[in-house]
UniProtKB/Swiss-Prot annotation:
Top-level taxon: Bacteria
Reactions catalysed, as given in the entry: L-glutamyl-tRNA(Gln) + L-glutamine + ATP + H2O = L-glutaminyl-tRNA(Gln) + L-glutamate + ADP + phosphate + H(+); L-aspartyl-tRNA(Asn) + L-glutamine + ATP + H2O = L-asparaginyl-tRNA(Asn) + L-glutamate + ADP + phosphate + 2 H(+)
Record carries keyword ATP-binding: yes
Organism (species): Bradyrhizobium diazoefficiens (strain JCM 10833 / BCRC 13528 / IAM 13628 / NBRC 14792 / USDA 110)
An MF annotation (GO) of this entry: asparaginyl-tRNA synthase (glutamine-hydrolyzing) activity
One GO BP annotation of this record: glutaminyl-tRNAGln biosynthesis via transamidation
Family in the record: Belongs to the GatB/GatE family. GatB subfamily.
Annotated protein name in UniProt: Aspartyl/glutamyl-tRNA(Asn/Gln) amidotransferase subunit B
């Protein structure tokens, strides 16, 4: 059930609504290709991971890779989708130099996964449910290289035959924000499942985006497809541009041509590639070299029983068990590695219920803040979960103050080391000796008689005195003791 309001675009004739559907091409995580034993490793020398099957040598027959089927079924289960116990591989016929067979082995009428849905969270606590039409398995074609020779186009077949999952959404997406959030959520689910690494820079996750516009609540318009998007930000830019392009044409009295377009990131615009093909243009028919794919319900149930905890389930648990806000829990579970880091911190602290909120604050505000500033991800964090847990522990037991903890975090970030040993060796322990704190308090009050006289009328100025005492003590004074002493001496 959608709770999201969506963005309408203003035109000369009033508001327009976007209608967006997406086809996500996700490379299956497996050691070998869909129908051959060739390696799927990224970055090899051109044409070094190629078998005779991949390049369609005469007499070579495809043999299905069971692991790819397992990964597709696991993904379908993660999308709350219907798993079809019988599916069929079809030949999708078209000519392109990077497709040596002259056809692509795909699935048309009988895909391995049927309808499902994904809950997509948006800013401000809003959400939208995007329906999944189907998930089918197909071969990736090769890669054409046009910049290696002034007169030739070269082909690298390393990618040819690698297993792809094509995840087709229903046209439930209504603006660029929802589209970006949908791709982000799909990628997160597949990373949790281990079925696709989602690395868009390597081409392991690509999106075809279908965009049309209409008057709100009106009939669906003619759609254009933007091909091979490999960046979430570019997806957002392409949708905005394409929708406005269509609105301008319609408001000028023109008609939208159904076509395939590509996005030019340098100019921020879409450009026509070719007219959009219909299914009959591909002359689909069942592949005679492959039997129908059949498996039992027990096979599906066994895979379902072994699924890991997925982002939505983990978020619900974090809110219930650790008292986190829905927002904080969403941030922590967005990437599997972030959730693992957070739970490792809690394991080291020992009392999950007690320390959950404090650990979340440190992970989100201090750690993630610093990682984002330096353009790193959690796997490249200089501060380990064990080190962060030790810092939080030192605060909890009163050994250091929150301010000193931030200084300690900076030292560990830059130099590494054991936080407890650093506190000892650098004299960073919190001062809890009341007589020592009292002397500093007395000195601050004596140096500011006017402010001290006004504090009864302006109780909020107590914070200024606390700040001065903490500054004078180098941040080492126990904040609770400072507050109590100041209130006593100032008569508040």
């Amino acid at each position: 059930m959608s709770t999201a309001t969506h963005k309408l675009l203003k035109g000369a004739t009033g508001d327009w609504e976007m209608v967006i559907g997406m086809e996500i091409h996700a490379q299956v995580t497996s050691n070998s290709k869909l129908f051959s034993g060739a390696s799927t490793a990224f970055g090899g020398e051109p044409n070094s991971h190629v078998s005779l099957v991949d390049v369609a040598m005469p007499g070579m027959l495809p043999v299905i890779n069971e692991e790819c089927v397992r990964q597709a079924v696991r993904t379908g289960l993660g999308l709350n989708a219907k798993i079809n116990l019988r599916s069929v591989f079809d030949r999708k016929n078209y000519f392109y130099p990077d497709l040596p067979q002259g056809y692509q082995i795909s699935q048309y009428k009988s895909p391995v996964v049927g309808e499902g849905e994904v809950l997509v969270e948006l800013d401000g606590g809003r959400s939208v449910t995007v329906g999944i039409e189907r998930l089918h398995i197909e071969q990736d074609p090769g890669k054409m290289l046009h910049d290696q020779s002034p007169s030739l186009s070269l082909i690298d077949f390393n990618r040819c035959g690698v297993a792809l999952m094509e995840i087709v959404s229903k046209p439930d997406i209504r603006d660029a924000e929802q589209a970006k959030a949908y791709v982000t959520k799909l990628r997160s689910i597949m990373r949790y499942l281990g079925t696709c690494d989602g690395d868009m820079e390597k081409g392991n996750l690509r999106a075809d985006v279908n965009v049309s516009v209409r008057k709100p609540g009106g009939p669906l318009g003619t759609r254009c497809e933007i091909k091979n998007m490999n960046s979430i930000n570019f997806i957002g830019q392409a949708i905005e541009y394409e929708a406005r392009r269509q609105i301008e044409i319609l408001e000028d009295g023109g008609q939208i041509e159904q076509e395939t377009r590509r996005f030019d990131p340098d100019k921020g615009e879409t450009r026509s590639m070719r007219s959009k093909e219909e299914a009959h243009d591909y002359r689909y028919f069942p592949d005679p070299d492959l039997l129908p794919l059949e498996f039992s319900q027990e096979f599906v149930d066994e895979l379902k029983a072994k699924l890991p905890e997925l982002p939505d389930q983990k978020k619900t648990r974090f809110v219930a068990d650790f008292g986190l806000s829905a927002y904080d829990a969403s941030v922590l579970v967005a990437e599997r590695e972030s959730a693992v880091f957070y739970e490792t911190v809690l394991d080291k602290l020992g009392d999950r219920a007690r320390d959950g909120k404090m650990a979340a604050n440190w992970v989100i505000n201090e750690l993630f803040g610093r990682l984002n500033k330096e353009g790193r991800d959690i796997t490249g964090s200089p501060v380990t979960a064990e080190q962060l847990a030790a810092i939080i522990d030192l605060i909890g037991e009163g050994t250091i103050s929150g301010k000193i903890a931030k200084d300690l975090f900076e030292i560990v970030w830059q130099e590494g080391g054991d936080p407890r040993a650093l506190v000892e060796s650098r004299g960073m322990k919190q001062v809890t000796d009341l007589s020592a704190i009292e002397k500093v308090v007395d000195d601050i009050i004596a140096a500011n008689p006017d402010k001290a006289a006004q504090v009864k009328d302006k109780p909020q100025s107590l914070g200024w005195f606390v700040g001065q005492v903490m500054k004078a003590s180098g941040g080492k004074a126990n904040p609770q003791s400072v507050n109590e002493l100041l209130k006593s001496k100032l008569g508040i």
